[in-house]
Amino acid sequence: MYGIVMFVNRKEELEFLERKWNENKANLIILYGRRRVGKTMLIKKFLENKKIKRASIFC
């Protein structure tokens, strides 16, 4: 499956990020887990339709 990116079963995580995004205050969110489980893809998927000037992502 090289070259194919699958993004499934992340509805709960995306809803959590959306709730935090819509709060009118600063938040620090630490996303952790085993390697190669889709942490970076989750953040990219969440941010793809957001109008932001800058985002810092450390992997």
Curated annotation (Swiss-Prot):
InterPro entries for the chain: ATPase_dom, P-loop_NTPase
Alphabetical UniProt keywords: ATP-binding, Nucleotide-binding
Keyword Thylakoid: no
SUPFAM superfamilies xrefs: P-loop containing nucleoside triphosphate hydrolases
Binding-site residues for ATP, renumbered to this chain: 33-40
GO MF, one annotated term: ATP binding
Protein name: Uncharacterized ATP-binding protein MJ0423
